[in-house]
UniProtKB/Swiss-Prot annotation:
Name recorded for this polypeptide: Citrate lyase acyl carrier protein
Keyword terms: Cytoplasm, Phosphoprotein
Family according to the record: Belongs to the CitD family.
Origin species: Lactiplantibacillus plantarum (strain ATCC BAA-793 / NCIMB 8826 / WCFS1) (Lactobacillus plantarum)
Domain of life: Bacteria
Assembly description: Oligomer with a subunit composition of (alpha,beta,gamma)6.
Taxonomic placement: Bacteria, Bacillati, Bacillota, Bacilli, Lactobacillales
Residues modified to O-(phosphoribosyl dephospho-coenzyme A)serine: 14
Subcellular location: Cytoplasm
Function, as annotated: Covalent carrier of the coenzyme of citrate lyase.
Pfam families linked to this entry: ACP
């Protein structure tokens, strides 16, 4: 699926993550900012990548600013940003 517009989901509050998706042309590229990047950076990137792959999004630039979000929050924010970027109103139930 192709990203139609830049989209954002999430906040910069504690225990949340802000995900911004932009059109890309070279696979899934993730720019992650996090205070816990050394401990959890690989896991955060894995959750984002897996969620985008489940949504059949192959080419996207991701800007993620993590403030200690749990995996379920990261997945929810990624799904929301993707639906906004794809300009779809129908939830992807199979990913949930």
């Amino acid at each position: 699926m192709e990203i139609k517009t830049t989209a954002v989901a999430g906040t910069l509050e504690s225990s949340d993550i802000q995900i911004m998706l932009m059109a890309g042309d070279n696979g899934i590229q993730i720019d992650l900012e996090s205070d816990v990047i050394k401990q959890f950076g690989a896991q955060i990137k894995h959750v984002i990548t897996t969620t985008l792959q489940q949504l059949n999004i192959d080419n996207v630039k991701v800007r993620a600013v993590d403030k200690g979000a749990l995996d379920c929050v990261i997945k929810a924010r990624t799904i929301t940003a993707a639906q906004r970027a794809l300009e779809t109103t129908t939830p992807a139930w199979e990913v949930l």
